[in-house]
């Protein structure tokens, strides 16, 4: 058989035409997920394609200092952004990060001989949807907490729900309606007084970047959705990453191996009380490189500007559309009522007009 020998312009035209047959974030809005979707800058693809990053994960530490340095640097970036003591990069997705964080919570309660007692995880109705499944997979009974008339966590109902059986409260702040939990400090106190842990779902971290940190609000564990906040690819089934940050007293339970700096060198080590591995090696390396490059490129001022524009864009859109918005004030997103219109028709219209 004679292989085809098309000219380069023909090949370029062919693949360009194929790309135009698919829908992508370059063609229009990408409204997947309850989070702030955005354009991912293409420079991070160049960074991830560098040959220096293509090393074998079993290479000895002394010959992988650059790679370990990036992993350690990303841990430090994320911990600082979230107000945590440290972080693990191993979980391969946001939901996997939730599962990992809850396994850390179980290990903590087990270390206090309370694992058999603390069998419940409280999840508000306004929480990110995966929280319910993650808690169940971690072996917990899920207690759903209805929202109050303002769309937030009702403090009175929370006080009745917590007790000696409470392992954790999972909270998304701002929540799926874009509402900030204004009673967060009181909520944290209620959970901690009952002996539970406060878990932060980072789905909506875009609204807080550079302006507020979950750790300062009283959260003990959090996961970061790098595909929602730090410009890594979204959707498609992976590969992905869902780093988990924790406060100091929970650090010893994080997955192994961990990356640390000692005497000016980076090394891997296994904490004695680790929950073990949740993914191969240090997670999906090239995804993590993209998140590192994005954070390093923006810096403190850039991250702060990102959150400002996320909130500004949502509020600008709310002023422009003619729909009923029952809750507010909101941050990076809002929920609107379609009224007599069909929500599916609205979505199709957005695609038709490239809104």
Tell where the protein language model's regions lie, with residue ranges:
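N-terminal glycine-rich, Lys/His-bearing helix-loop that initiates the first secondary-structure elements
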Residues: 1-52
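Conserved N-terminal alpha-helix of the aminotransferase class I/II PLP-enzyme fold
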Residues: 8-11, 15-21, 51-92, 97
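Conserved phosphate/anionic-ligand binding catalytic regions in large, soluble enzymes, centered on
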Residues: 23-44, 90-101, 230-245, 282-293
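A glycine-rich phosphate-binding loop feature that marks nucleotide/adenosyl-phosphate handling sites
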Residues: 31-40, 91-97, 124-127, 204-210, ...
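Terminal amphipathic helices with adjacent charged low-complexity linkers/tails
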Residues: 31-59, 323-355
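Gly-rich Lys/Arg/Thr-decorated short loops/hinges at beta-loop-alpha junctions or inter-strand turns
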Residues: 49-62, 80, 136-146, 165-170, ...
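Conserved PLP-enzyme active-site core in the AAT-like
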Residues: 66, 96-263, 340, 344-348
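Active-site C-terminal subdomain of aminotransferase-like
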Residues: 221-332, 337-339
């Amino acid at each position: 058989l004679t292989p085809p020998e098309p000219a380069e312009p023909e090949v370029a035209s062919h693949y360009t035409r194929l790309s135009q047959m698919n829908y992508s974030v370059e063609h229009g809005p990408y409204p997947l997920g309850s989070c702030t979707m955005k354009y991912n800058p293409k420079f991070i693809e160049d960074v991830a394609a560098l040959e220096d990053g293509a090393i074998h994960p079993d290479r000895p530490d002394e010959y992988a200092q650059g790679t370990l340095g990036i992993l350690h640097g990303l841990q430090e970036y994320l911990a600082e952004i979230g107000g945590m003591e440290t972080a693990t990069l191993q979980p391969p997705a946001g939901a996997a990060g939730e599962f990992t964080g809850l396994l850390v919570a179980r290990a903590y309660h087990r270390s206090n001989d309370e694992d058999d007692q603390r069998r419940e995880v409280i999840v508000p109705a306004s929480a990110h949807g995966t929280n319910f499944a993650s808690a169940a997979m971690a072996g917990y009974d899920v207690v759903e907490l209805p929202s109050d008339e303002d769309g937030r966590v009702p403090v009175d109902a929370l006080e009745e729900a917590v007790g000696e059986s409470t392992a954790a409260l999972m909270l998304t702040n701002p929540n799926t309606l874009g509402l900030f939990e204004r009673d967060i400090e009181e909520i944290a106190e209620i959970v901690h007084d009952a002996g539970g842990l406060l878990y932060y779902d980072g789905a909506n971290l875009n609204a807080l970047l550079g302006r507020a940190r979950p750790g300062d609000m009283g959260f003990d564990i959090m996961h970061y959705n790098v595909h929602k906040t730090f410009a890594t690819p979204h959707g498609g089934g992976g590969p992905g990453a869902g780093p988990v940050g924790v406060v100091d007293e929970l650090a010893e339970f994080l997955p192994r191996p961990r990356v640390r700096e000692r005497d000016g060198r980076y090394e891997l080590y296994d904490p004695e009380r680790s929950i073990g591995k949740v993914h191969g090696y240090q997670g999906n390396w090239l995804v993590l490189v993209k998140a590192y490059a994005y954070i390093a490129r923006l810096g403190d001022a850039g991250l702060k500007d990102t959150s400002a524009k996320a909130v500004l864009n949502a509020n600008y859109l709310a002023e422009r559309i003619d729909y009923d918005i029952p809750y507010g004030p909101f941050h990076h997103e809002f929920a609107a009522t379609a009224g007599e219109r069909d929500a599916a028709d609205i979505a199709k219209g957005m695609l038709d007009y490239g809104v």
